[in-house]
Swiss-Prot record:
The gene is SPATA18. One of its GO terms (biological process) is mitophagy by internal vacuole formation. InterPro entries: MIEAP, MIEAP_C. One of its GO terms (cellular component) is cytosol. One of its GO terms (molecular function) is cardiolipin binding. This is Mitochondria-eating protein. The keyword Mitochondrion applies. It comes from Gallus gallus.
């Protein structure tokens, strides 16, 4: 008996059965019905093996004790348990298990029949859907074939249209080229006509002057041939046809022209200057450089207008001095003529001279995309005003300004971005208008600390690039 017991203990059947019970308990919810039944049957088999070994040990133990040894224990413990288990197993649980299995098999067969029916229906639906899909696919293939044919036709039409458009573009380019050539020819003719008209006007003025000279000469010849002084006095010449107004017109209108020109100079500063700045700012981002360009344009415009006025005055004096006679002096006659014929001033030549001077000025620079001609209308208006100011008595001129000079409260206003504690001018924004060294309209300047040193460094670089300093250049211009 002891050997059988030791063998059972070493077999560890109970421990293995416990592990299988725990594993089954964990996997019960995820296992299928067949897997759970297999697990249960396996445990029953293990239990029956262990029970068989225990009954063997029970028989051997009772045999070793004698025929009647352990009878009481078997009666009180084993027989009641066996009776209870067999009664329950045979009467209740086996019946319930059989009934449950019958019901389960019936339900399973019913579900299988339903599943087979549903699968048959699904298969029929799938076949019908497949048939309809095939029909739709055939329609789509037919539509695709028609679309491809239409696409080929469209490509052919598009190629034809492109060829036609290319021919039209070539023809239009030829027409455009011819139109541009015709336009350029028309512009050249128009310029030639303008030049001819200007020449005609000049010739008319010269003819009027020559007529005046002719009348003067004829009167002199008549006086020289007259025998008596009394007849000479009676044949005094008529007024020159050159003057269509009263004598001394320039002197009589000097005050009104002075007020008008000063007001126009202020309008250029307050309106036209900002228009020119807006044009330059589209090409130049540096505001200081833009203001320097505007100031240089104003100064150069006055210089070019003064030079043109001197040349124009010399020509008029030379022409009128030949046959001048009358109560007025030659200077008054010349001034009257210039005031009446300011339209003969060749302002475009002065504009070209200003732009040429600005291009060689080392203090200002421009971008490759920008030319100073973009503000030619601003320069033209300045030249006209400056030329008219030279006909005043006394004439008006702009003040000379230089970077690094001491700021003058009587001559300039400070710009809004100035350092109001600085005493030196960094650069000028607008020139002051002078009359006999007296300021009548203030200019505008920017004051900053350290302007003298920056001016000296710029002056050294300018001296290396130019043979004449700006001061000497200004003095030579004023002469």
């Amino acid at each position: 008996m002891a050997g059988s017991l030791k063998k059972l203990a070493k077999a560890e059947s109970c421990r293995l059965m416990q592990e299988k019970l725990e594993s089954w308990s964990k996997d019960y919810e995820i296992n299928s019905c067949d897997q759970n039944l297999n697990q249960c049957c396996e445990l029953i088999e293990m239990t029956s093996v262990i029970q068989g070994q225990l009954f063997t040990i029970l028989n051997e133990t009772s045999r070793e004790s004698g025929h009647y040894a352990g009878v009481d224990t078997i009666k009180t413990r084993l027989l009641p348990w066996l009776g209870t288990w067999f009664s329950h197993a045979t009467s209740g649980r086996l019946f319930e298990t059989g009934l449950f299995l019958n019901q389960d098999s019936t339900e399973t067969e019913r579900k299988l029949r339903q599943l087979a029916t549903s699968q048959t229906l699904q298969l029929q639906d799938l076949q019908e859907e497949l048939t309809s899909t095939r029909l739709e696919l055939n329609h789509v293939q037919q539509d695709l074939a028609q679309t491809q044919l239409a696409l080929e036709d469209t490509k052919t039409q598009l190629a034809t249209t492109l060829l036609t458009a290319a021919d039209e573009i070539i023809q239009l380019r030829a027409v455009l080229k011819a139109s541009r050539a015709q336009e350029e020819d028309s512009l050249r003719r128009l310029d030639h006509l303008n030049d001819c008209e200007q020449q005609i006007e000049r010739l008319r003025d010269e003819l009027s002057i020559l007529d005046a000279q002719k009348s003067v000469l004829q009167s002199r010849i008549a006086r020289s041939r007259s025998p008596s002084p009394r007849r000479i006095r009676s044949r005094s010449p008529s007024p020159l046809p050159l003057r269509s107004c009263s004598p001394g017109r320039a002197r009589s209108t000097n005050a009104s022209r002075h007020a008008f020109l000063v007001a126009r100079f202020g309008d250029i500063y307050s309106k036209d200057r900002f228009d020119a700045e807006r044009i330059l700012r589209t090409y130049i981002s540096d505001m200081e450089m833009v203001q320097r360009i505007i100031y240089t344009a104003a100064v150069e415009s006055f210089h070019a207008a003064k030079m043109a006025y001197r040349q124009f005055k010399m020509r008029v004096r030379k022409t009128l001095s030949i046959g001048h006679s009358g109560p007025e002096s030659l200077e008054d006659t010349v001034m009257d003529y210039i005031v009446r014929h300011e339209d003969l001033y060749d302002v475009q030549a002065s504009v070209n001279e200003v732009i040429r001077s600005m291009n060689i000025n080392p203090k200002i620079s421009s971008t490759p995309e920008c030319d100073f001609a973009v503000i030619s209308s601003f320069i033209r208006e300045l030249c006209r005003v400056a030329f008219s100011m030279q006909t005043l008595t006394p004439p008006l001129d702009v003040a000379f300004g230089m970077d690094g000079e001491f700021f003058s409260e009587t001559k300039y206003h400070r710009s809004v971005d100035s350092d109001y504690t600085a005493a030196l001018v960094a650069y000028h924004v607008w020139p002051a208008l002078m009359e006999n060294d007296v300021v009548i309209v203030k200019g505008e300047a920017v004051t900053k600390r350290g302007a003298l040193w920056s001016h000296r460094s710029r002056s050294r670089s300018q001296n290396r690039s130019r043979s004449v300093s700006p001061l000497l250049s200004h003095l030579s211009r004023s002469r």
